[in-house]
A protein has these predicted regions:
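Short gly/ser-rich loop at a beta-strand->alpha-helix junction or flexible surface loop bordering the NTP-binding
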Residues: 1-172, 206, 295-325
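Surface segments flanking catalytic/ligand-binding clefts of nucleic-acid enzymes
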Residues: 14, 148-325
Length: 325
C-alpha cells in the first residue's frame, strides 16, 4: 500500500510512530512524504518499480511516461533500466534528474494521454515509442510484441505515435526497433528467440506454424521455424506449461501433452530445436544450432516433412501499414 504522510496522520499515526515504522523496516520512504509497505518492494523488479511510480504520482502533477508507463501498462521490459521513475512535465524547462526520478519535458498532445488507476500516463502506443527511443532494443520490441498480442494497441496507433515523435531525439532508433514488432509472439522468450535468430547468417523464420498430418488432422502449433528446411523451434520458458494448461489440467498433463505434440512433429519428419533461457547467455551458440539443423535439408536423401502446415497471419493492420515512418 502506498500512502502519504498526511494520510497517515489523518489515520492517527504520529510522526514519531511513522519514524519507528521506517526504522523497523516495516515501511520504506519512496519520495519525500510518500511511503509504502516494505513487502511491496520485495517482489520482482517491475513490481518494485510500479510501487515507486505510484508513490511519485501521488505528489507530483506529472505524466508518467517512458519505461515507467510501460510498467504501469503491465508490459514486459527485459533489460530495461528501472533505476529511475520516468515522468514528463509538459512543455516546461528541460530534463531533470534526481537520484530516483527522471523528469522529461516536452509536448504530449491529449490524444497520447490517458489515466490508469487514477494516474496520468502516456497511452500504450506513445509509451512504446518513448521506450524504443530510450531503452535497449530487446526491451522495446518485447514491450511492443506484448502490447500487440494483448490488443492493447494497433500497428496503426504505433505508426501514428512514431509520426508524432518524428523530430524527437532517438526517433530513428525507435522506428528501427518498432519495425521488428510482431504481435504473434506469446512470451518475452519468444521475442528474444526471434531477435536472436534475426541475423545475416540465417534465413528469415516464420512464426506460429500450425502443423497437420497427412489426413488434415491438427498436430500442434510451433513457436517458429524454417519451413523450406523442415525445422521448427520451440521456446521453453518457466511459464510455458502454465499457459498451455486447459481447464482442469495439471502441469503434468500439460507436460505430457507437450511431449505428444513434439512426437507428432518428429513423426511427420520435422526437426524440432528447443530453446530456453540458458541460450540467452550465448546467442551465437543458438544460431549455430539452428544452422546445423537447417543444413540437414541439404544432405543427400533428405525428404521434406509430410502432412501440411499453415502460418498464423500477422496482424491485418500490418498488411496495410508500414512502420517505416
Amino acid at each position: 500500500m502506498v500512502f502519504t504522510r498526511a494520510e497517515a496522520v489523518a489515520d492517527g499515526v504520529s510522526d514519531s510512530e511513522l519514524k519507528s515504522l521506517l526504522k523497523r523496516g516495516d515501511h520504506v520512504r519512496l519520495v519525500r512524504g510518500v511511503y509504502a509497505d516494505a513487502a511491496e518492494l520485495a517482489g520482482w523488479e517491475e513490481d518494485q518499480h510500479r510501487t515507486r511510480v505510484m508513490g511519485v504520482a501521488r505528489i507530483s502533477n506529472l505524466l508518467v511516461s517512458h519505461i515507467s508507463a510501460a510498467v504501469l501498462h503491465g508490459l514486459p521490459v527485459p533489460g530495461g533500466d528501472l533505476t529511475e521513475v520516468h515522468a514528463t512535465r509538459l512543455g516546461v524547462g528541460g530534463n531533470r534528474h534526481r537520484s530516483t526520478r527522471h523528469v522529461h519535458s516536452g509536448i504530449v498532445s491529449p490524444e497520447w494521454q490517458t489515466t490508469l488507476e487514477g494516474v496520468y500516463v502516456t497511452t500504450v502506443a506513445r509509451t512504446l515509442v518513448d521506450v524504443a527511443k530510450t531503452q535497449p532494443r530487446l526491451a522495446a520490441v518485447t514491450a511492443a510484441d506484448a502490447a500487440l498480442h494483448r490488443d492493447l494497441c494497433t500497428y496503426e496507433e504505433i505508426t501514428d505515435a512514431l509520426h508524432s515523435a518524428y523530430r524527437h531525439r532517438g526517433a530513428p532508433r525507435a522506428r528501427a526497433a518498432l519495425r521488428l514488432a510482431d504481435g504473434r509472439a506469446e512470451s518475452p522468450g519468444e521475442t528474444w528467440t526471434r531477435l536472436a535468430l534475426t541475423h545475416p547468417s540465417l534465413p528469415p523464420c516464420e512464426l506460429q506454424i500450425e502443423v497437420y498430418d497427412e489426413h488434415g488432422r491438427f498436430v500442434g502449433r510451433a513457436d517458429g521455424g524454417y519451413l523450406e528446411h523442415g525445422v521448427l523451434w520451440e521456446y521453453d520458458g518457466q511459464d510455458k506449461y502454465h499457459r498451455l494448461l486447459a481447464p482442469g489440467q495439471t502441469t503434468l498433463d500439460a507436460v505430457l501433452a507437450e511431449k505428444r505434440r513434439e512426437s507428432g512433429f518428429t513423426e511427420l519428419g520435422w526437426l524440432v530445436v528447443r530453446v530456453d533461457s540458458s541460450d540467452f547467455r550465448v546467442p551465437e551458440t543458438l544460431r549455430r544450432r539452428m544452422l546445423d539443423a537447417i543444413a540437414r535439408s541439404s544432405r543427400p536423401g533428405w525428404l521434406p516433412p509430410t502432412g501440411s502446415w499453415a502460418v498464423m497471419p500477422r496482424h491485418l493492420s500490418m498488411q496495410r501499414t508500414s512502420l517505416t515512418a
